[in-house]
Amino acid sequence: MKTIGLDVGTKTIGVAISDAFGWTAQGLPTIQRSEDDPNRDFEALAQLIKENDVQKVVIGYPKNMNGTVGESATRSETFARTLEQQCNVQTVLWDERLTTAAAQRVLIDADVSRKKRKKAVDKMAAVFILQGYLDRQSHTLT
């Protein structure tokens, strides 16, 4: 069973996918969000879900640092509900606090240029979100 991880932003959606065993997360191409037709975002994800036989989607849940739910987290909740309805897939909201900052730090430490970092950060954040979820799942199973 494969799982997809998403870092949903206002302009892009970072995407990662697990291996068949649910051990590791790998980045996939970032989806550019459509301002004109939000359904295109869900159509792209539906195709990805179908092509990869995905059973579950882990969506980054950007809580505030004090643990409260703000505007961004509410948007993630709405996105998750819509994805469940349109793609008939189970979704999980996963605390994503500091994943983007961690992704930025890794890219800076790897001496990736600012231009390339901008393109890679959403994908890497999605990998961090999904890998965190997978690690927790394997830890609770042992």
Curated annotation (Swiss-Prot):
Main location: cytoplasm
Domain of life of the native organism: Bacteria
Enzyme class at the top of the EC tree: hydrolase
Record's keyword terms, sorted: Cytoplasm, Hydrolase, Nuclease, Ribosome biogenesis
GO terms for cellular component: cytosol
InterPro entries assigned: RNaseH-like_sf, YqgF, YqgF/RNaseH-like_dom, YqgF/RNaseH-like_dom_sf
GO biological process, alphabetically ordered: rRNA 5'-end processing
Subcellular location: Cytoplasm
E.C. numbers: 3.1.-.-
Cytoplasm keyword on record: yes
SUPFAM superfamilies with a match to the protein in the record: Ribonuclease H-like
Nuclease among keywords: yes
UniProt GO molecular function: nuclease activity
Pfam family, one: RuvX
Function: Could be a nuclease involved in processing of the 5'-end of pre-16S rRNA.
Family: Belongs to the YqgF nuclease family.
Full protein name: Putative pre-16S rRNA nuclease
Species the sequence originates in: Shouchella clausii (strain KSM-K16) (Alkalihalobacillus clausii)
Lineage of source species: Bacteria, Bacillati, Bacillota, Bacilli, Bacillales
